[in-house]
Amino acid sequence: MAKIVVTGGAALHGEVSISGAKNAVLPILCATLLADEPVEITNVPHLHDVVTTVKLLGELGAKVTIDQGTLSRGSAIVVDPRPVNQHVAPYELVKTMRASILVLGPLLARFGAAEVSLPGGCAIGSRPVDQHIKGLQALGAEIVVENGFIKASAKRLKGGHFTFDMVSVTGTENVLMGAVLAEGTTVLDNCAMEPEVTDLAHCLIALGAKIEGLGTARLVIEGVERLSGGRHEVLPDRIETGTFLVAAAMTGGKVTVNRARPNTMDAVLSKLVEAGAKIETTDDSITLDMQGRRPKAVNLTTAPYPAFPTDMQAQFMALNCVADGVGVINETIFENRFMHVNELLRLGADIQVEGHTAIVRGSEHLSGAPVMATDLRASASLILAGLMASGDTTIDRIYHLDRGYENIEEKLSSLGATIRRVP
């Protein structure tokens, strides 16, 4: 099983380009099932979860064409949903990736039936699917959960009013996709406002959907008879953007991230400024300059967008490990999302966990050690800590990393990091 070895000590300098957003491309690929003509998706990152989604679309009968036949950086994927002849998403694929549940709404809306295995994929909490089920039931779907499958049917979904009990990104996306082909008008309240949800809505609109309220907690969808083909470019990944900016801040370097979307980064950028970074932005780039200084510890609480993202919590914990002062991190989104703490402790970090709160006392010195990635963002935090540790840090189970970061070792190497992948 492959590992990544990081040798610490180098400040990062240079420029790096950001890939398409993992959390946008997965629902957008699933949304192609709603169309009755081919759909082209561009700026697709080469990630394991994208490969899994492409396999799932193929299992359902869709014809998927990837430029040059393989997924390379910034690929284009054309999905032709016309040959779809299955409505069952099998356990073998769904168990490896929770986002597989995002075919539920499209299959139900387009073909009147869907069977999706209950999801697996992440070890960071229960992430209940009840909001998906309740939302689609509010649109007239008949749904039962049996034998490990969500089984849904409806002749045609009908517009309705549904308020999410809790903010759910994938729940919002699934019900939104179901509503675009429903008969009549649907009003969804307490929707997730994440940029990736808005990007999905922009894609649906490009295919002919009628959606109002983008970027707000209320979405109003006027159902249409059909969605046509079209083209959509996936927005840049704000979590990858934040990860590289934190790496620059931790190492006292200066890095410019290009092909970024600064207007989706307010919460993260404000915390980096609080940590002592000098930041300049353009419409599509962010430059962070630490001017050789050690970062200051920051306090943060994760919450739904536009507040601080849970997907950046582990990276900022790594920053606090080497910062000047004490930082308090409150995790309010997922339980069990401090699994990286024990691995950071192996590098010499000083962290105390009390329930959903971690108290991090900054240290001027970390030392390299073998560590194990436990989930996607935890694996990134271990790489960041490794950049600051003396000697080598060897990170095992990096298949987590490949689910959400495209060529991270190449990109970090281009900025001056000593990092390599080994068998």
UniProtKB/Swiss-Prot annotation:
Its main location: cytoplasm. Pathway: Cell wall biogenesis; peptidoglycan biosynthesis. Signal peptide: none annotated. It is found in: Cytoplasm. One of its GO terms (molecular function) is UDP-N-acetylglucosamine 1-carboxyvinyltransferase activity. It is an enzyme of class 2 (transferase). Phosphoenolpyruvate binds at K22, N23. The keyword Cell wall biogenesis/degradation applies. One of its GO terms (biological process) is regulation of cell shape. It comes from the Bacteria. The active site is at C122 (proton donor). Its EC number is 2.5.1.7. SUPFAM superfamilies: EPT/RTPC-like. Keywords: Cell cycle, Cell division, Cell shape, Cell wall biogenesis/degradation, Cytoplasm, Peptidoglycan synthesis, Pyruvate, Transferase. InterPro entries: Enolpyruvate_Tfrase_dom, Enolpyruvate_Tfrase_sf, MurA_subfamily, RNA3'P_cycl/enolpyr_Trfase_a/b, UDP_GlcNAc_COvinyl_MurA. The modification 2-(S-cysteinyl)pyruvic acid O-phosphothioketal is found at C122. Gene3D superfamilies: Enolpyruvate transferase domain. One of its GO terms (cellular component) is cytoplasm. It catalyses: phosphoenolpyruvate + UDP-N-acetyl-alpha-D-glucosamine = UDP-N-acetyl-3-O-(1-carboxyvinyl)-alpha-D-glucosamine + phosphate. It holds the Pfam family EPSP_synthase. UDP-N-acetyl-alpha-D-glucosamine binds at R98, R127, P128, V129, D130, Q131, D311, I333. Cell wall formation. Adds enolpyruvyl to UDP-N-acetylglucosamine. Belongs to the EPSP synthase family. MurA subfamily. This is UDP-N-acetylglucosamine 1-carboxyvinyltransferase. It comes from Stenotrophomonas maltophilia (strain K279a). The gene is murA.
